[in-house]
Swiss-Prot record:
Its cofactor is Mg(2+). This is CCA-adding enzyme. CDD domains: NT_ClassII-CCAase (cd05398). Homodimer. InterPro entries: Bact_CCA-adding_enz_type3_sf (IPR050264), CCA-adding_enz_C (IPR032810), CCA-adding_enz_firmicutes (IPR023068), NT_sf (IPR043519), PolA_pol_head_dom (IPR002646), PolyA_RNA-bd (IPR032828). It comes from the Bacteria.
Length: 402
């Protein structure tokens, strides 16, 4: 088949493919970008594959960067903007995958079929020339029409080569609403133990995308049915089942933090920060999720808790509570937030230096205690956030200590 109209991203890259062709080599758009064009989805990355070897690409284009030349990839700087920088990879075959993630060795080839047959799924094994002609060597168009994910060739071999493909399949089931072809799913289940060989950082990325997909329930169901959950750090299948059965069917997560918090509210005997440490997430992400889980346990918002967690987290938590069927006052968080004089201690009109100057105080525990007390009183609306009111209050506190 031929595309009626090339997407703008392909049109912009057309001269690159044409130039390679003018030098006697083949060049195609490949991978997920072609799939997304056929699905009418937004393109994120334009990948180009060619029969030209890396050194030949460098001879054709004056401005290039070696970004992965040992694997056949050269970055071509076709223009000044980053959008005009293209990774061009030579057709290749791959040897065994000792680490179940990356090939031990690659060989450059001139044959497009040899390159495409090493790809993960048929819907990712399309090629498209600069005129929009689609090359489909593995019946991917049929799978695309049926919204079916089928491994290219032997599914067992594909997952042996790269076990992360198991998580990618689940992610596609979530983000693209694809079902998994029977033999492909059977191979996923049989090879799920190989996920232990994959870094948790890479698994996290795929699982995170799964959770944010429009059909995340499909993805989580596959995670359970494939038994892949057993090989993820500290995962509990009962918790996953609870999320599927207890969360309202039409709920979609606002962000990653909310999604992971939803899972963790259903885990038993879990220390959120210890759990997330095993997933090697950032401290910022870990704290955010831990805050959401802690806030979820609160019965109601008050001035102190709203100040501590902030309105953004409060609203995310309230969405989860409602989605899990808890009866809450939907307007309370905003109402309480409006009653707060400050939302951060930096908004207090007087700083420690002001108190040191006014009362001849020195830095130390006493000053810290005074500042903390002032902050608490302002939050509870027991003290106005005004200079005279605060100085008067501090004076009283110091007199009581004499």
């Amino acid at each position: 088949m031929k595309l009626e109209k090339l997407p703008e991203e392909f049109v912009q890259a057309q001269p690159v493919l044409e130039k390679i062709s003018e030098h006697g080599f083949e060049a195609y758009f490949v991978g997920g970008s072609v799939r997304d064009v056929l699905l009418g989805r937004e393109i994120h990355d334009v990948d180009i594959a060619t029969s030209a070897y890396p050194e030949e690409i460098k001879d054709i284009f004056p401005y290039t960067i070696d970004v992965g030349i040992e694997h056949g990839t050269v970055l071509v700087l076709a223009g000044k903007s980053e959008a005009e920088h293209y990774e061009i990879t030579t057709f290749r075959t791959e040897s065994k995958y000792t680490d179940y993630r990356r090939p031990d060795h690659v060989d450059f080839v001139r044959d497009l079929r040899e390159d495409l047959k090493r790809r993960d799924f048929t819907v990712n094994a399309f090629a498209c020339d600069f005129e929009g002609q689609i090359i489909d060597l593995f019946d991917g168009l049929t799978d695309l029409k049926e919204r079916r994910l089928t491994a290219v060739g032997s599914a067992l071999e594909r997952f042996n080569e790269d076990a992360l493909r198991i998580m990618r399949a689940m992610r596609f089931a979530s983000t693209l609403d694809f079902k998994i072809e029977e033999k492909t799913f059977s191979a996923m289940r049989e090879r799920s133990h190989l996920l232990e060989k994959i870094s948790v950082e890479r698994i996290f990325i795929e699982l995170d995308k799964l959770l944010l997909g429009s059909e995340w329930r499909n993805g989580l169901t596959l995670l359970i049915e494939s038994e892949a959950w057993k090989y993820l750090p500290d995962f509990q299948d009962l918790a996953l089942k609870k999320v599927l059965t207890e969360l309202s069917v039409d709920f979609h997560f606002k962000n990653s933090e909310q999604a992971w918090a939803a899972l963790l509210t259903r885990f038993s005997n879990i220390d959120v920060k210890v759990f997330l440490r095993k997933w090697k997430v950032s401290n910022e992400f870990s704290k955010y999720v831990a805050d959401l889980v802690s806030a979820y346990e609160l019965e109601n918002w008050d001035l102190v808790s709203l100040y501590h967690f902030g309105l953004e987290k409060a609203l995310l938590v309230d969405e989860l509570k409602i989605a899990f069927g808890r009866d809450i006052d939907r307007e309370r968080a905003v109402f309480i937030n409006d009653q707060l004089q400050i939302h951060d201690k930096s908004e207090i009109v007087i700083a420690g230096k002001d108190l040191m100057d006014e009362f001849s105080l020195k830095p130390g525990p006493e000053l810290g205690k005074i500042l903390k007390t002032i902050e608490e009183k302002i939050v509870k609306n027991e003290l106005k956030n005004e200079q005279i009111a605060i100085l008067t209050e501090v004076k009283k506190m110091l007199e009581l200590e004499k």
